[in-house]
From Swiss-Prot:
Entry text on domains: Consists of three domains: the N-terminal catalytic domain, the editing domain and the C-terminal anticodon-binding domain.
Keyword Transit peptide: no
The protein, known as: Proline--tRNA ligase
Keywords: Aminoacyl-tRNA synthetase, ATP-binding, Cytoplasm, Ligase, Nucleotide-binding, Protein biosynthesis
Example GO molecular function: proline-tRNA ligase activity
Subcellular location: Cytoplasm
GO biological process: prolyl-tRNA aminoacylation
Catalytic activity field: tRNA(Pro) + L-proline + ATP = L-prolyl-tRNA(Pro) + AMP + diphosphate
Entry function: Catalyzes the attachment of proline to tRNA(Pro) in a two-step reaction: proline is first activated by ATP to form Pro-AMP and then transferred to the acceptor end of tRNA(Pro). As ProRS can inadvertently accommodate and process non-cognate amino acids such as alanine and cysteine, to avoid such errors it has two additional distinct editing activities against alanine. One activity is designated as 'pretransfer' editing and involves the tRNA(Pro)-independent hydrolysis of activated Ala-AMP.
Main localisation: cytoplasm
Subunit structure: Homodimer.
Family per record: Belongs to the class-II aminoacyl-tRNA synthetase family. ProS type 1 subfamily.
Annotated Gene Ontology cellular component terms: cytosol
Length: 596
């Protein structure tokens, strides 16, 4: 390919809408063009990158016996309603684009394809003899992001590889899950990325277990917690840990103390010389579920800890057997709108009476009560007395007559001790999610009645796994991790071109002929090569080559008359003056191929 035919359009200035460096470089390098918020055109350079990533993915999955298919992007609402996800994906903060056809039937543009593939498999697979099976596709997905940003990192239209496996039993599912985890590690390694695999929350996809593959980068949206020895890692949404014991409050006779205007943990501690770890703080939440009902929730946690909203939402969903569409803290204004005026915020205890909800206009009439392990482990504590300006001291859970759901809803944080080894502590880094794998179990096969006949001749539900890779996001993540002040530094395996040849002076016949000779030889040897044949200054060509990030640069310049060219490595910034044969030998060694 010649630059004169490439439609290359680079920018020197940083685009105003691009917040992170990878987004800036992709726009400046002419890789993407913004059409509207969260929607981009993949220009020829990026399309070559995406095709190379796709090729690596397809090759690796084929070695695992996966079958490639292409599923419809438009999906009927009926199967999503059967799985229980239609409302959660189309209402509130749901991410599915939905529409109606001419007959008034509701459809959705697929953000994911669990329902569709499960329906297809249920109509196709009938016996254990046909299992296991693993099917994947690579296609454009759609998500109505609340706040699309960071270019391809969080866009409304993107390319994704999603795979779905079906099994006769849990052991077989776990075996394929392990195979796919290994395949992902191979894929990301071949793409030249530094990544970590961490435990993750299953989110709206659901299932028993899941892991994320994260490219480590300071601009990453996710906070990852990793043990010092590297044996444990998790997204903070999922992470578990051991907290410090804190300053224990020795048991004594329970009593009530006056605490005027001491609504916060800090105020309570400063006025009374308490420690936050001696306090049970209670927060009121409101959970909105897919049945359109609103459930008040009282959450108790140790005063020096934070609530993990994801864990809390999951616990409520599990308890109610309903999807939580939204969860948020209740404020005094919310209470007033419900006609409730006597809740003493800042002085609430775990035993706040349900009677206060009797007059509510649109909420359920009882609190769901949840206590984090950190609070439940306290034998003696301070908490609100449910009366303004009053707290209880030396209180204990035996004195509280309301039933609490006990679970882990605490946000693990850096410095916490690790579950697997108390001598290890959690350390933090930020990451960009590029892959996610799930053990779904029978979640979808039961809701969609996808069954098969097992070895005993009994009808049973299929076991299922799903596995996603963000292809377009991976491309930008590679840039976020591989760049310098001059531009992109593509890993060789996914670079749009492996080599760029620059003719320093297009009017110099020696330079032009030598460059053309090298160009043709590289093409003959199937090297992905770009020839910069523009009638432009050499400095402009060098800057463009650095910006677009081609791994190897050959310059036919002043020494061309002697048959010598400069061979420059974009990553190491080393330059050698070599003759044609030496260049070809050097590149063949670097590409680990037969002699060029």
């Amino acid at each position: 390919m010649r630059v004169s035919r490439l439609m290359l359009n680079t920018l020197r200035d940083v685009p105003s809408e691009a917040d992170i460096i990878s987004h800036q470089l992709l726009v400046r390098g002419g890789y993407i063009k913004r059409i509207t918020g969260g929607i981009y055109a993949y220009m020829p350079l990026l399309w070559k990158v995406l095709k190379k990533i796709t090729s690596i993915v397809e090759e690796e999955l084929s070695t695992k016996g996966c079958l490639q298919t292409l599923l419809p992007q438009l999906q009927p609402s009926e199967i999503w309603e059967r799985s229980g996800r239609w409302k959660s994906y189309t209402q509130g903060e749901g991410i599915m684009f939905s529409l109606k056809d001419r007959q008034g039937k509701e459809l959705g543009l697929g953000p994911t394809h669990e329902e569709v593939i499960t329906q297809i498999i249920s109509q196709t697979i009938h016996s254990y003899k046909q299992l296991p099976i693993n099917i994947f596709q690579i296609q454009t997905k759609f998500r109505d992001e609340i706040r699309p940003r960071f270019g391809l990192m969080r866009s409304r239209e993107f390319i994704m590889k999603d795979a779905y496996s079906f099994h006769a039993n849990e052991n077989d599912l776990q075996s394929t899950y392990s195979d796919m985890r290994n395949a992902y590690q191979n894929i990301f390694t071949k793409c030249g990325l530094d990544f970590v695999c961490v435990d993750a929350d299953s989110g709206a996809i659901g299932g028993a277990a899941s892991q994320e593959f994260m490219v480590t980068a300071e601009s990453g949206e996710d906070l990852i917690l990793i043990s010092s020895d590297g044996k444990y890692g998790a997204n903070q949404e999922k992470a578990v840990s051991i907290i410090e014991e804190g300053n224990l409050l020795e048991p004594n006779k329970p009593s009530i103390i006056k605490t005027p205007n001491q609504k916060t943990i800090d105020e309570l501690c400063n006025y009374n010389d308490f420690h936050p770890s001696q306090i049970v703080k209670v927060l009121a939440y409101l959970a909105t579920c897919d049945d359109n009902k609103k459930y008040p929730v009282l959450v108790s946690i140790r005063g020096d800890q934070e609530i993990n909203d994801i864990k809390l939402s999951n616990k409520i969903s599990q308890e109610l057997k309903k999807n939580v569409l939204d969860i948020r803290i209740i404020y005094n204004e919310d209470m007033q709108k419900q006609g409730i005026t006597n809740i003493p915020f800042g002085f609430i205890g775990p035993d706040l009476s349900d009677n206060l909800l009797a007059q509510s206009k649109g909420w359920e009439k009882k609190f769901i009560r949840i206590a984090d392990n950190s609070a439940k482990d306290l034998k003696s504590f301070i908490c609100g007395n449910n009366i303004k300006d009053e707290h209880k001291i030396f209180y204990n859970w035996n004195l509280i007559n309301t039933v609490q759901l006990i679970c882990d809803i605490r946000k693990a944080k850096p410095g916490d001790r690790c579950i697997h080894d108390k001598t290890q502590k959690l350390e933090e880094c930020r990451g960009i999610e590029i892959g996610h794998i799930f053990q779904l179990g029978t979640k979808y096969s039961k809701s969609l009645n996808a069954t098969f006949t097992n070895e005993k001749g009994i009808e049973d539900h299929l076991w299922m796994g799903c596995y996603g890779i963000g292809i377009s996001r991976l491309a930008q993540a590679a840039v976020e991790q591989n760049h310098d002040d001059l531009g992109i530094i593509w890993p060789t395996s996914i670079a749009p071109f492996t080599v760029i040849i620059i003719i320093a002076n297009i009017k110099n016949n020696d330079q032009k002929c030598l460059a053309e000779d090298i160009y043709q030889k590289l093409i003959q040897n199937r090297v992905d090569v770009l020839l910069d044949d523009r009638d432009d200054r050499a400095g402009i060509k060098f800057k463009d080559a650095d910006l677009i990030g081609i791994p190897w640069r050959i310059v036919a310049g002043r020494e061309a008359s002697s048959g010598l060219v400069e061979l420059h490595n974009r990553k190491t910034k080393t330059t050698e003056l070599l003759d044609l044969n030496s260049v070809l030998k050097k590149l063949s060694e670097e590409f680990n191929t037969e002699k060029l």
